[in-house]
Amino acid sequence: MTKLSGTDSKSTLYCSFCGKSQHEVRKLIAGPTVFICDECVELCNDIIREETKAGLTGRKEGDVPAPSEICATLNDYVIGQDRAKRVLSVAVHNHYKRLKHSGKADGVELAKSNILLVGPTGSGKTLLAQTLARTFDVPFTMADATTLTEAGYVGEDVENIILKLLQASDYNVDKAQHGIVYIDEIDKITRKAENPSITRDVSGEGVQQALLKLMEGTTASVPPQGGRKHPQQEFLQVDTTNILFICGGAFAGLDKIIADRLQKRSIGFGAHVADPDKRKVGELLEKSEPEDLLKFGLIPEFVGRLPVIATLHDLDVDALVTILQEPKNAIVKQYSKLFELEDVELTFTDEALQAIAERAILRKTGARGLRSIVEGILLDTMFDLPDLDDISEVVIDADVVEGKKEPIRVVSNDDDGKKEEAA
């Protein structure tokens, strides 16, 4: 096809779509008997982008995806945790269905159901929240509860969470008011003792008190540029009633509180008392009740704002091996892509993947530790790779993972044969 820009030609050409002449646009692209200008091309791109954002499922804009559809999307990115995914899918479906029908005056007001994710580190809590936001194409922000303090103290105000959500929505207040907020490390703001203290706890119980109104629904006054408030400053008013709050934490030690409660209930002649040490942490967390969270250090009002509790299990070796290679953004796929950009094939043997997963189990870092292990294995190879022209493949086996030898570098001969060359 030919590009024609505006010239002083006798025959003036026009865009077949908008009718503008070649002198009114920057570029006019010629096709068989038709022309299209650069403005129409840009408009077509915008239309395609908007349709892509609306989703590839054929849903009309404003339709709420079914729980099974939400769960299927979560399955593409998160391995295992089937029960947690079902709980999340139903809760989020009901939340956005509530928003869609909130204007109907039938006398029934649907309450908001914020979500608490309980599970060990590296089990997928953060990834679940991120995937949910991607599914609904809504503003999403993450906050670390350990950095939050009460207003007026050194640290980050809880209202800064809403500021981050505004920034994620390009300061579109209406869009931000339907976003998702994920607060990580929520177990780190528990009060220091089960009984109320006479001393001020500005980073524990004080933060829980400050978060209460945000989570229940209030109009937050947010300074557009962040920072501390002062009287002369203009504020953005954000209604948090329809913002979905998801809180996550490892809650280390909660399993022991649950085990103690279950053991007390089993006292008596003929009672079957299971050894708490033989129970898996995930099995105990599934039996968590509000009274356990209160004993852990959350205040009753805060627990009441989190009616939906989803528990996640420790990931076993098989799950970690699957995480390494199957999700859409799997770690092995990411590093294979990096090597592919250097025209080199990266291969992990099954034994190597098993060894990487076992090392992550020993480190007790869950799926989060897989990337650092793979990065350490491939670091020297990635350093040398741009300077090596004859390498066609790099093979990682179990001995490489265990540090017994260097990654196997495969070089190509002129006759397209291959031979192995140790690094």
Curated annotation (Swiss-Prot):
Question: Could you give the subunit structure recorded for this chain?
Answer: Component of the ClpX-ClpP complex. Forms a hexameric ring that, in the presence of ATP, binds to fourteen ClpP subunits assembled into a disk-like structure with a central cavity, resembling the structure of eukaryotic proteasomes.
Q: Name the GO terms of the biological process aspect.
A: cell division; proteolysis involved in protein catabolic process
Residue stretches making up the ClpX-type ZB domain: 3-56
What UniProt keywords are attached to this protein's entry? ATP-binding, Chaperone, Metal-binding, Nucleotide-binding, Zinc
Query: Where is Zn(2+) bound in this sequence?
Result: C15, C18, C37, C40
Q: Is ATP-binding tagged as a keyword? A: yes
Matching entries from SMART domains are given as:
AAA, ClpB_D2-small, zf-C4_ClpX
Family to which this protein belongs: Belongs to the ClpX chaperone family.
Family annotation (InterPro entries) = AAA+_ATPase, ATP-dep_Clp_protease_ClpX, ATPase_AAA_core, Clp_ATPase_C, Clp_protease_ATP-bd_su_ClpX, ClpX_bact, P-loop_NTPase, Znf_CppX_C4
**Does the keyword field hold Protein biosynthesis?**
no
This entry carries the following GO cellular component terms, namely: HslUV protease complex
Where, in this chain's numbering, is ATP bound? P120, T121, G122, S123, G124, K125, T126, L127
Q: Which Gene3D superfamilies match?
A: 1.10.8.60, ClpX chaperone, C4-type zinc finger domain (6.20.220.10), P-loop containing nucleotide triphosphate hydrolases (3.40.50.300)
Q: What is this protein called?
A: ATP-dependent Clp protease ATP-binding subunit ClpX
**Species for this entry:** Erythrobacter litoralis (strain HTCC2594)
Job of this protein: ATP-dependent specificity component of the Clp protease. It directs the protease to specific substrates. Can perform chaperone functions in the absence of ClpP.
Recall the GO molecular function terms of this protein's record. ATP binding; ATP hydrolysis activity; ATP-dependent protein folding chaperone; protein dimerization activity; unfolded protein binding; zinc ion binding
